[in-house]
């Protein structure tokens, strides 16, 4: 049996639908937020990655959105609550960093929730400026040069 692998997730595929459900459960539902049609339509131009603990069990996801030819924004990083604290998020981020570098990007930017900021600092992301409010909670703009 195949265990613990990361793969690209094609937009509008069954795996993408599963990724959306996981992102909603971890990131949106606790804040009472829904996805808009416009937000989901924009995702067709983004790059999605999934961490599967088995061939049919998605436990972590993240999305990368090109800002320009040099910068890509990491978004919607989510790991199922029952699978957190096992290195899945770190593996996803490292995979995305390798992907970004191979794709020719020179820098990754992200908006980290207050609670996630130490996680990104451990992965050598740096804070830019002061904290700000996004979707009703404190965030930090962060970046990493590849």
Where are these regions (language model features)?
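Anionic, Ser/Thr-rich low-complexity intrinsically disordered regions
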Residues: 2-123, 128-145
């Amino acid at each position: 049996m195949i265990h613990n692998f990361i793969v690209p997730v094609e937009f509008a595929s069954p795996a993408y639908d599963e990724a959306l459900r996981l992102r909603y459960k971890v990131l949106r539902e606790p804040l009472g937020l829904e996805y808009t049609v416009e937000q989901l339509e924009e995702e067709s131009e983004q790059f999605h990655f999934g961490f599967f603990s088995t061939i049919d069990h998605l436990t972590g996801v993240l999305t990368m959105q090109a800002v320009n030819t040099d910068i890509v924004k990491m978004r919607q990083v989510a790991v199922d609550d029952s699978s957190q604290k096992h290195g899945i998020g770190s593996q996803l981020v490292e995979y995305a960093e390798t992907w970004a570098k191979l794709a020719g990007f020179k820098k990754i930017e992200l908006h980290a929730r207050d609670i996630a900021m130490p996680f990104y600092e451990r992965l050598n992301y740096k804070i830019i400026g002061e904290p700000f409010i996004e979707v009703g909670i404190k965030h930090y703009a962060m970046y990493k040069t590849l």
